[in-house]
Amino acid sequence: MAKKREKARKWFAHRGINPDNTLTNPEDRQFYKLDFPPIPVEYENAPSLQCQIDIISFLFYSHVTVLFNDPSGQEWEYEGGAGGLGVGDISGEGILTYGDLDTLTKATTFEVSFISADGGGTQVSWGSSGNAFAAGVGEGFGVFGGSGGWKKVG
């Protein structure tokens, strides 16, 4: 998790955000740099694919990555940052559902919630574009909303 935490710090630094600030000063509150989430939906007859979810939390910020292979074998990675409240990290394998691959991979805003104490679960939602659920290992809890983007890997 140390490498993932360092990757998360670099992601926030690139956007001018210090994820370790305490928000005691109003100018430290940089949530306006992150978009906020859509509402999750359920899909009928949606494809279900295996995915990997990693969440690194910094009290008021979190860094989220989701990896999966589409039906053609192409690997995709979503990477984003969010504002909210939580502590700890979680990493887990789960299921990704979506209605349309093109719609999912164009989604930017998301919400994430997780709870873990030597096991637990997480949900990442792109609203009507897709949802990912995982059981994982780590310790912590959190609820965040933010934005990011998809890219093809490899």
Regions inferred by a protein language model and the residue ranges of each:
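A membrane-pore/channel beta-structure motif
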Residues: 2-154
